[in-house]
Amino acid sequence: MDTVNPTRPRNVACAIAGLIAVLVVFHAAGALAELKQEGAGIVKSVVDGDTLILTDGREIRLVGIQAPKLPLGRRGFKAWPLAGEAKQALEKLTLGKRLTLSFGGRRMDRHGRWLAHLHTKSRLWVQGALLKEGMARVYSFADNRAVIAEMLALERESRAAKRGIWGNDFYQVLKAEKIDRRRRGFQIVEGRVLKVAPTRRRTYLNFGRDWKRDFTIVIEARSRRAFPERGARLKKLEGKRVRVRGWLRWRNGPMLTATHPEQIEVLGK
């Protein structure tokens, strides 16, 4: 007769956690090379899944990721799924610990929060660990694009394994040809670019024949300079399958604005 070993699940979980830590440290080695280390601090408290406060009063927004959001006093705001778990994950990684701050772009946001990458004494990359555990998504800006490739790789692995948020429909990757009109906010969308239409003021990446109904990526003229050859190579995306992330809005059909190339991943033909 087979017997059940009650310690096995715990051992397996510990082994998986250990493997994740090793992989994140490996990714951190490459990430550190691209970032400028400057300062350190001890974590006093955690605000939510991507924000914490140091003992010296500095508020740190973990740049490059977006964790599920908590209301944080906002009237009528409903917590996103797994927001509490994401906060707990960040607490487990950082609370009471001394962290090194590293920067790869703009250093402070309009709220006065420091936009930093964080590493523990053992060189564990905090952003990488959260992505690996499925407790955050990659969330980049035109003025903060460092180590995005490394973060996207960790996110892809986590999504494929359906860890954390990737097992919840709220965070599912949307299909460009079938976006529910109730969808709003920060989204990830996949589909095939049918046509690239550059104009003087902006470039449109159309995913269907009817621009009044179908999904479109918009790149403003001022943002084209961030793309290879000032946007001239965008034409090569025609016929390609891509994954794009950003804030979804509805203007005629569903629309998403891209300000930098890291928002658009080319998946193939």
Q: What do these predicted ranges mean?
A:
Residues 2-18, 23-269:
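Small beta-barrel nucleic-acid-binding modules, primarily SNase/OB-fold domains
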